[in-house]
Amino acid sequence: GYLKSILRDNDIIGVGMGTTIRYIATYAPRQFQNLTFIPLLGGTGNVDYTLDANHVVDHLSKAFCGEGQHLYVPAVVSHVQTKRTLMKEDSIRQIMNAYYHLNVALVGIGTADNTSSAFRSGYYSDEMKQQAVRDRVCGDICMHLFDKEGRTDCFPYNKQIVGVNLNKLKKVPYAIGIASGVRKAEAIRGAIKGGYINVLVTDAQCGEALTRLNDELNN
């Protein structure tokens, strides 16, 4: 219902990874023309191909009778220089440029632990996970880890991610975060503090947990 109220013909929609976003296809309104779906990060097929942003793009573009574009590179590369080299490719640069023109972004919000898709992707070594704990990381959006204040610079490995810079999400008219469950409350709050989402879709239990968390931190 909400998507139906905000989508317009010719919109460009950025899509993150995860099953929650893929399920949006179940409720897809079909009355829109020329919707374009693009992945907000490279491939994460190591964890489960159905979670991969490129796969989610395929799923949604089919459901909405739109067009899907793809980012056929790893979500995380081993060196920043590798990322710079990849960015010179026309097909990748085209996707990166499209991030400046997003009308809607659909992103999941993960927790910074082994239950999250980011940590289960196989891209993060045990050393990197330990670094995340030391840096007090609390959540992720599109594999970018952030702390409770929404800061991403706390985790140096974010620079090796091939995908949208979270600061670009701040300029998207509808940056929709989708997450549920009490354990996601701190991560959601960090995402809100960082300004990466301006719409939240969650459940009642998580909403109550967020309210309690805010009350505790403000007292």
Residue ranges of model-derived segments:
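Conserved phosphate- and dinucleotide-binding cores of soluble alpha/beta proteins
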Residues: 44-219
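Beta-hairpin (beta-strand-turn-beta-strand) motif
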Residues: 18, 40-42, 73
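Structural beta-sheet core signal
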Residues: 15, 37-39, 70, 177
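Short, surface-exposed basic-aromatic patches at helix termini and helix-loop junctions that form
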Residues: 29-31, 192-193
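Catalytic or ion-translocation cores adjacent to nucleophile or general acid/base/metal-coordination motifs
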Residues: 34-44
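Short coil/turn segments at beta-strand junctions that form active-site/ligand-binding loops
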Residues: 9-11, 33, 102-103, 173
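Helix-turn-helix/homeodomain-like alpha-helical modules used for DNA recognition
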Residues: 1-30, 37
